[in-house]
Swiss-Prot record:
Residues 67-96 have a biased composition (Low complexity). Residues 131-203 are annotated as: Leucine repeat I (LRI). It holds the Pfam family GRAS. It comes from Oryza sativa subsp. japonica. This is Protein NODULATION SIGNALING PATHWAY 1.
Length: 523
């Protein structure tokens, strides 16, 4: 796909991305029926089967795989999956033509989730009995942690037959989960033992790494994701509303002050055009006299690898675009970059300082979280915006939990991402979706650093310990967020703030995804 860039001026907050979007929409072709060879070969029975029959077949494979071995006679092997007991690694299919095809190849009419149809659709279904990938991956994680290599090998064979980065949410989860378990295996059992386990090769072309993508594709993917999914868009909208209010102390008719935003997040500039535009529409038409944006790099925490979605590719720089846009709406904008929060130097006393901590701190180790919050408190900000995943698990090693249990929690969260992106992209296998899903899959990395998140209650305790007190969202901000959510798939919902919980939570089909909360320095 080719992305051509040209400078744009004026218009709304996303005009500076217009070229990316036009290229993206031109390339948005439904590939659901374009993959695979229709010849069928030895697997025509699989392609020709109805979706219900396909699901039943996979269900029987899962049941057979997870059932205890019979003492009387060995169970019959699946028509497609070789029995590890009777097969050597060389017998395992290594070509996509020897694997079960994904639904994108089998069912040209399938479009995944769609607006108004998120209740049971969206790429694989929400019911536990339909989520076969987790039924295979979680026992495999337990086997890896226990060092049960024969069990690991057996499940690797089965997962290798069913995985597909272009299939429905189950097939894609199997693909991401299998690769994550294969990377974890040497650390769990030792390199020598891990070398004896054969990892089925992936026959599909590898997806470009998020931080190594072509800059125009990277930018267009972020924009498209905000257009079709509220995963980041809703927390960003809530943050922007709170920041705009902070610039005037929340008082109607108050004189706007210079605004300084410290961005320790994952928006890569996509969040800010909307904020800049809203600042020019303040009551009385009085925008802040100046706006300063300090972007804190992905190395602000020592976590390795860096938090998903936090790194950008070499050559990607949103600053020139954003500066041109600010100039077109007569806003004085300055952009600087900081390696850590230590370099985010506050400005004048009259400056409204807001620190945005969005989707990065939750991937850091417990001590790093405390240190970053301590530094944020030291800046004495007017407001802190905290947006994080709402998975409700704790740091591994800190609560006695097992690595396999942590893997299961991360797998649950990744399922929600994959199922919701199926709905967002209407089942289409496009490069932008693959790029985003590959980065989201990084959450399955070996669970030896930090958890996927610790839930709202855990963060409330952590913020209070750092010297902050929770602040409520304005009614207008909440209503605007609710209105924004209506443009997305009906599987999305948000829980409004209450006296007991001031944060706004985002949910997919009733299950928690993330929350956005506001904090001020405690008196």
């Amino acid at each position: 796909m080719s992305y051509h860039e040209e400078e744009r001026h004026g218009g709304n907050g996303l005009d500076w991305f217009e070229e990316s979007m036009s290229s993206l929409l031109a390339a948005d072709v439904d590939l659901a029926g374009g993959g695979g060879d229709a010849g069928g070969g030895g697997y025509a029975w699989w392609w020709a089967a109805s979706p219900a029959a396909q699901q039943d077949d996979i269900g029987s494979v899962v049941a057979q795989t997870l059932s205890p071995p019979s003492t009387a006679a060995p169970a019959a092997a699946s028509p497609s999956i070789a029995s590890p007991a009777a097969s050597s690694p060389s017998d395992v299919p290594s070509s996509s033509s020897k694997k079960r095809k994904s639904p994108a190849h089998r069912a040209p009419g399938h479009t995944g989730g769609k607006k108004g149809g998120g209740g049971k659709g969206g790429g694989g279904g929400s019911d536990r009995d339909m989520r076969w990938a987790e039924q295979l991956l979680n026992p495999c994680a337990v086997a890896v942690e226990a060092g049960n290599l024969s069990r690991v090998q057996h499940l690797f064979y089965v997962l290798g037959e069913l995985e597909s980065f272009s299939g429905d949410a189950n097939h894609r989860l199997a693909a991401h989960g299998l690769r994550a378990l294969a990377r974890w295996l040497p650390a769990a059992v030792g390199p020598a033992a891990a070398a004896a386990v054969r990892v089925p090769p992936c026959s599909e072309r590898p997806t470009t790494a998020f931080a190594a993508a072509e800059p125009r594709l990277f930018r267009a993917s972020l924009i498209r994701f905000h257009e079709v999914s509220p995963w980041f868009a809703l927390p960003n909208a809530l943050a922007n509303a709170a920041i705009a209010q902070a610039s005037t102390c929340g008082a109607a008719g108050a004189t706007p002050r210079p605004l300084h935003v410290v961005d320790l997040g994952v928006s890569h500039g996509v969040q800010w055009p909307t904020l800049l535009e809203s600042l020019t529409r303040q009551p009385g038409g009085r925008a802040p006299p100046s706006v300063r944006l300090t972007v804190v790099g992905p190395g602000a925490t020592a976590t390795s690898p860096v938090a998903p979605f936090s790194a950008s590719p070499p050559g990607y720089d949103f600053s020139p675009h954003l500066l041109r846009y600010a100039k077109s709406i007569n806003l004085d904008l300055r952009i600087s970059r900081a390696a850590t929060l230590d370099d985010a130097v506050p400005g004048d006393d009259g400056e409204a300082l807001v620190v945005c901590l969005q989707f990065r701190l939750g991937h850091a180790a417990a001590e790093e979280r405390r240190e970053v919050l301590r530094k944020a408190r030291g800046l004495n900000p007017e407001l802190v915006v905290l947006s994080e995943l709402d998975s409700g698990v704790g740091v591994v090693g800190g609560d006695g939990g097992s690595a396999a249990g942590e893997f299961a929690a991360r797998l649950e969260l990744l399922w929600r991402f994959l199922e919701s992106t199926s709905a967002a992209f209407k089942g289409k296998d496009v490069e932008e979706r693959r790029l985003l899903e590959a980065e989201a899959g990084a959450i399955l990395a070996a669970a030896d650093v930090a958890a996927a998140g610790e839930g709202r209650e855990g963060w409330r305790e952590r913020m209070a310990a750092a010297g902050f007190e929770e602040a409520p969202f304005g009614a207008e901000a909440v209503e605007s967020a609710r209105s924004l959510l209506r443009k997305y798939d009906s599987g999305w919902e948000m829980s409004a703030p209450s006296p007991a919980a001031a944060a706004v939570a985002l949910r997919w089909k009733g299950q928690p995804v993330s929350f956005c909360s506001l904090w001020r320095p405690a008196a």
